[in-house]
Amino acid sequence: MNPTNYDPRIGQPAQSRPQVSLSMGRRIVQMPTGLPRSYQDESHNEPVGWDEPSGVGGSSGAGGQQSDKPTGLRHFSTKVCEKVKEKGLTNYNEVADELVADYFQNNLIKQIDVVKQEYDMKNIRRRVYDALNVLLAMNIITKSKKDIRWIGLPASASQEISRLEEEKSRREASISSKKQALEEMVLQIVSYKNLVERNRKNEHKNGRPENDTVLHLPFLIINTDKEANVECSVSSDKSEFLFSFDKKFEIHDDFEILKKLNLACSLETTNPTAEEVKTAKSFLPTLHQHYVDEIIANRKKVEAEKEEKRKQQQLIADQMSMNLSQAQYVEPTSSLAQMSYSSRFNRQLQEHLINDGSEDRSAAAGIMERDYDMDKNVNQGSASRGPMYNTYSPQKIRAQVNTPLQVPPVTKRYYVQKTQGPMKHDMTPVVRTVNRPYSTVPPDRRLSTGATSVNSGPVKYYVPQGHQPMHQPVGQRYRVRPQQPQMSHMGQPHQVQQRVVYPAGSISGHQLQPGQRIVTQRIVAPGGPHPPGTIVRKVIRKIVVNNPKQSPAQQVIQKKMMEQDMCTFERKTEQPMTSAQAAALIQHPQPEEYDYFQ
């Protein structure tokens, strides 16, 4: 290495040296005269040149030469980082020598001070050593023996993940493009060697052809319509051609023509024969013959993905056409009539909960109807099934794929009304018979036969708004008998509670044992109209044994306890029930109470 001639500088006392400070990108240089001198530091990454200040009092003598070059750790840390990043792999001596050379070359000083020059050299090397240790501690560089390798500036986890994802996608795209280029090259080699083999056989059989009939590679073929007007201009050296067409035209290169002549041994397709594969491998070196199998496997994989995508699109199109078209259902046989789906959407109730802005819309998610909610005797009536039975559900679509269209089971309809007046949705007699929430057994035979409510659950029905009573079918289970209003001392009627009682024929005394009695009592919320969603459960029916040994005090205590229970239940029923609670009761009915009449 050639020795470096360092420029001299004038030695100064420590108290007369320029004091340098860095603050917000500006350097403030304190001159010996006491006047500050500042200049803008535009970029710390660019090489900095230290300007020589003018002498004191405007003199330009040798004794007035001053230097404002920085020698701090912050400055040399930036320089060291730039040097290591630029080289990638370096060592301590190389970085220190280059920084020392740059430092003294950027300071033009006419006089030489050997002592000061030696001090600055040691100071710079010490700063470089400290900067390398800082970068090593921050994991920006790595050190192996004397070699120093650049890693990179630290970043956050999200930035590092995004950078790695971009790098991964970029490399995957590069690998994919290189694989395609490799496949094209393999096909070109096979095509060219197959063409050479065919020409050799033809020349051996028919002799060498004339020069006018030989088409040399590479070439281009341009074809267009027979009636098209083509204008062609050729340069003097026949290196440039200018074509003008008045109709569409196509351009084919030599490789495309060779593939159309089947000289690529059908490797561009997915089903080459074993003989063609063997011929193609014979044209390649032994080290590259496995690429033929990889090309065929990749072609088959791409073709399978395209076929799968096409099937999915076709299935989606078929489902959409099935939903949009008015399907004509075929009446199923007796065996198909008993088939029911595991779950179905209750569309009317779900739409009501979704459209009701005052309720919680999350209650509409996943409202289903179970199998026992479907009545078995759906074919009792002779009425034709209309479009109200054509409901959509993913379960029905999955069940009807690749099967003939079938009539779906009847779905219960639950209507919740918010405005006053009678129910807007009136059901047909057939639907009313199916969806009646109680048994069709007459009341006088219910106790004797031991019949219970439909689906072995509590009796539930909605109380409509308005004073107009709904049309009640024949054979109702119970009726509401209002009591006469009692007048208070203020002349205002009391809010008298209503009692739900059974008809006279519904109570049978021959089933009771001596000393037993039937207690039937149910308190309904007084007044009206009731809010939508109010549910009336079945009447409390219990067989109570008369206890003649009970003292009067015990009788009073028992009576008070019963009154408290009734008051608590009355307060609960006075609270309006939301649509979400009604949906929950419909979806998950309460467990059945013990039937004392069985």
Curated annotation (Swiss-Prot):
* Subcellular location, record wording: Nucleus
Ranges of Polar residues composition bias in the record:
13-22
Annotated membrane-spanning segments are none
User: What is an example of a GO molecular function annotated in this UniProt entry?
Assistant: DNA binding
Q: Which gene encodes it?
A: dpl-1
- Region Disordered: list its residue ranges: 1-73, 435-457, 573-598
- Listed Gly residues bias regions: 55-64
Which keywords does this chain's UniProt record carry?
Answer: DNA-binding, Nucleus, Transcription, Transcription regulation
Origin species, per record, is Caenorhabditis elegans
Q: What is the lineage of its organism?
A: Eukaryota, Metazoa, Ecdysozoa, Nematoda, Chromadorea
* Domain of life the protein comes from: Eukaryota
Protein name listed in UniProt: Transcription factor dpl-1
Task: Show the InterPro entries listed in the entry.
Answer: E2F-DP_heterodim, E2F_WHTH_DNA-bd_dom, TF_DP_C_sf, Transc_factor_DP_C, Transcrpt_fac_DP, WH-like_DNA-bd_sf, WH_DNA-bd_sf
Biological processes annotated in GO:
gonad development; negative regulation of Ras protein signal transduction; negative regulation of vulval development; positive regulation of cell cycle; programmed cell death; regulation of apoptotic process; regulation of cell division; regulation of cell fate specification
Q: How does it assemble?
A: Component of the DRM complex, at least composed of lin-9, lin-35, lin-37, lin-52, lin-53, lin-54- dpl-1 and efl-1. Interacts (via N-terminus) with efl-1. Interacts (via C-terminus) with lin-35 (via C-terminus).
Q: Does the keyword Nucleotidyltransferase apply?
A: no
